[in-house]
Curated annotation (Swiss-Prot):
Keywords: Hydrolase. Belongs to the acylphosphatase family. It comes from Corynebacterium efficiens (strain DSM 44549 / YS-314 / AJ 12310 / JCM 11189 / NBRC 100395). This is Acylphosphatase. PANTHER family: ACYLPHOSPHATASE (PTHR47268:SF4). It catalyses: an acyl phosphate + H2O = a carboxylate + phosphate + H(+). Its EC number is 3.6.1.7.
Length: 99
């Protein structure tokens, strides 16, 4: 595990809506990589997608905005009804994976 700059943070976002089977995890990965974030996007059994992103706080907040903005200015796929966010200390993940 690498040391993270002090401005790095971990975002965990639970995305509700029609977000499975539509390319949402792929879209999320592309947005996160564009912002220089590491983490993952995972389908959950209840139909939500769990997005974990680590990096500078301002970039994590930008990803959060992109996940929930209506209408999407970033060609987001699917339909998002709600995004529930949690913030914590980063764990030093690398890369961004779809699970």
């Amino acid at each position: 595990m690498s040391m993270q700059p002090t401005d790095h943070i971990r975002l965990t976002a639970f995305v509700h809506g029609h977000v499975q089977g539509v390319g949402f995890r792929w879209w999320t990965r592309s947005q996160a990589l564009e912002l220089g974030l590491a983490g993952s996007a995972t389908n959950l059994d209840d139909g939500r997608v769990c997005v974990v992103a680590e990096g500078p706080e301002d970039r994590c907040r930008e990803l959060l905005t992109r996940l929930g903005e209506q209408p999407s200015r970033h060609r987001r796929v699917g339909t998002v009804s709600t995004v529930i966010e949690q913030w914590s200390e980063p764990r030093g993940v690398e890369g961004f994976t779809e699970r």
